[in-house]
């Protein structure tokens, strides 16, 4: 889930430390593959463009709006470090387009990056027993659960930090966000299952671990 919070809403105590941590992680993640090939850079850029397109399209769900994040597939295909770099850049571009303020770029990168970081370990543990499509769907579900929980925590903190915000607003937001969270988990998992099945048939080398424990070429993109 993505934070669409404009600048000036969150107190600096909420977004400034998150932005500092995100920048540190961005530098550290860049050193993981400092000597990446042009093909790896192009691969990460292509997945980043796909993620940006998915996150820019909003799907109305009653009083709220939802958009795909592709956090699960992104984390599985790129790994934690590369996925975090891509998510940071994507969120910065979305902020320029008005999808959330610049002050929440760090928070969004951390919220989505946490889910992406868990997606690949979950996938590699599951793919030895299940099909790539099922494994990618389950890894995506875990990523969405983690990102959604962090999203709700940030929103709850923002409401509590507002001096004029009534206490009942947190319950209202939770009652609206929880069904959307469940729908988002289901939708993202279905999309991830389709991506996993497609790649298993057409480009199995892009998956990090093939069935039987063989390493895939996607591990080189991390």
Describe the function of each predicted region:
Residues 56-63, 89-119:
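Interfacial aromatic-anchored transmembrane helix boundaries in multi-pass membrane proteins
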Residues 134-148, 164-222:
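C-terminal transmembrane helix-loop-helix hairpin of multi-pass membrane proteins
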